[in-house]
Amino acid sequence: MTAITASMVKELRDRTGLAMMECKKALTEANGDIELAIDNLRKSGQAKAAKKAGNIAADGAITIVQDGNKAILVEVNCQTDFVAKDENFSNFAHTVAAAALAAGETDAAKIAELKLADGQSVEEARIALVQKIGENIQVRRAKIVEGEQLAIYKHGLKIGVVVSYTGDADTGKGIAMHVAAFNPVAVNAEAVPADLIAKEKEIAEAKALESGKPANIVEKMVTGSVEKYLNEVALDRQMYVIDNEKKVADVLKATGTNVANFVRFEVGEGIEKKAELSFAEEVAAAQAAAK
């Protein structure tokens, strides 16, 4: 049997990023053949990734990469905030975002097939990262924003915004911050999706009818409720985050700025999360997983 030296373990660790003991075990099983050890580790990584795929990944980070008049927002999910802050996770997310922007690709399934600079596909890099970190990791969604001027704002790892606009740069930055804070649905009332307005109208009608008031009064109540809703979700009607005595529309007009569109991503939007376990339940789950 080939003797496993420290230099062999170091080389395998440098090439895979895995722990020393895991590298030594892989080399022992491969009788010192580094290439075979790497192949075996990849196979075990695929198995581990498949096993982890059932775990809910609702944490993670929003990554934004800009290239000229284009920028991409990418949400990459993991299971814990601890991993979201990990440098390996961050590097993976940035690499994926850069590759997706260069390819002009926003479909998650097609992003998985993209080739990276080291020759790996995004999916192969994801599997390797799952093996290294030990959590389910998923590239969930991506969106490209194009425009003459772009303003980018990130609130920590969890919220990212890109605004396409023309006009004053400081106002553009302020609007990006505002979108992060107030989460508007659309640039103006006219752009609010019809299905959202219809849903709000339906709710307002049900409430108004319960009042038992005449039909003409009910109609006014519904109109007022819908108008209030539009004031809350249309960007131009909201009170500006930097100066809450002014509406966004007034700020845009005063600075000669026009917002074409925006995209806001927040980590975990729409993902159903499991109820948090108690400490005792966490310990029991960990013991069960170790068996």
Curated annotation (Swiss-Prot):
Describe the family membership recorded for this protein in Swiss-Prot or TrEMBL: Belongs to the EF-Ts family.
The keyword Cytoplasm is annotated on this UniProt entry: yes
The entry's localization annotation reads: Cytoplasm
The record's annotation in InterPro entries points to: EF-Ts_dimer_sf (IPR036402), Transl_elong_EFTs/EF1B (IPR001816), Transl_elong_EFTs/EF1B_dimer (IPR014039), Transl_elong_Ts_CS (IPR018101), UBA-like_sf (IPR009060)
One Pfam family for this entry, by name?
EF_TS
Positions of disulphide bridges: none
Q: What does this protein do?
A: Associates with the EF-Tu.GDP complex and induces the exchange of GDP to GTP. It remains bound to the aminoacyl-tRNA.EF-Tu.GTP complex up to the GTP hydrolysis stage on the ribosome.
Region Involved in Mg(2+) ion dislocation from EF-Tu: which residues?
80-83
**Main subcellular localisation:** cytoplasm
Q: Which keywords, in A-to-Z order, does the entry hold? A: Cytoplasm, Elongation factor, Protein biosynthesis
Q: Which CDD domains match?
A: UBA_EF-Ts
The name this protein goes by in its record = Elongation factor Ts
Q: Does the keyword Cytoplasm apply?
A: yes
Superkingdom of origin organism: Bacteria
Question: Any idea which GO molecular function terms this record carries?
Answer: translation elongation factor activity
GO CC, alphabetical: cytoplasm
